[in-house]
């Protein structure tokens, strides 16, 4: 469906303004769809992102600093998210005896199981781009990379 219909706006200042609004709108649309899937597993989008980072580092621990650097949403509070995951038993942490500021974080078996269940639902994530051909998906990826570049 066209953006103009979705947000009931007939005109934009120009095409660059329209793409900005379109990207923000599309982010919200995808986030809503993905949040529903994550909610089924008792986690948020940000918690999912952190779990994926932890799994990528596994079996080695990682630090809050590295998590923060790799997060998709740079404005998220990585320490708070890790604490929520710890409370749910999806992540664990180890505070250094020598330096109390150094905290190692790692994913638990329960956290891995949640990600495995979400991996099985990967097709649901991919269905959101099913209206695009593979060539269009590749082109969109290139254009988005170029825009940020």
Annotated model-derived regions:
Residues 22, 49-53, 113, 139:
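Pre-recognition alpha-helix immediately N-terminal to the DNA-recognition helix
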Residues 64, 82-83:
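Short, hydrophobic-biased segments on the C-terminal half of alpha helices
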Residues 1-41:
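N-terminal leader segment of winged-helix/HTH proteins
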Residues 28, 32-74:
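N-terminal helix-turn-helix DNA-binding core of bacterial DNA-binding proteins
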Residues 83-139:
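Charged, amphipathic alpha-helical coiled-coil/dimerization segments
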Residues 24, 52-59, 119, 145:
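Short, locally clustered residues in the helix-turn-helix/winged-helix DNA-binding domain
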Residues 1-12, 135-149:
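C-terminal regulatory/oligomerization modules of transcriptional regulators
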């Amino acid at each position: 469906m066209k953006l103009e219909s979705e947000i009931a706006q007939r005109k934009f200042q120009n095409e660059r303004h329209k793409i900005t609004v379109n990207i923000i709108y599309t982010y919200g649309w995808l986030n809503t769809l993905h949040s529903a899937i994550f909610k089924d597993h008792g986690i948020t989008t940000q918690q999912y992102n952190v779990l994926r980072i932890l799994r990528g580092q596994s079996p080695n621990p990682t630090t809050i600093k590295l998590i923060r650097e790799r997060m998709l949403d740079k404005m998220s509070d990585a320490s708070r998210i890790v604490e929520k995951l710890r409370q749910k038993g999806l992540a664990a942490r180890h505070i250094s005896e020598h330096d109390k500021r150094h905290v190692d974080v790692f994913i638990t078996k329960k956290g891995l199981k949640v990600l495995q269940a979400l991996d099985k639902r990967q097709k649901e994530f991919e269905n959101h781009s099913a209206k695009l051909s593979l060539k269009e998906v590749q082109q969109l990826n290139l254009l988005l990379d170029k825009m940020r570049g």
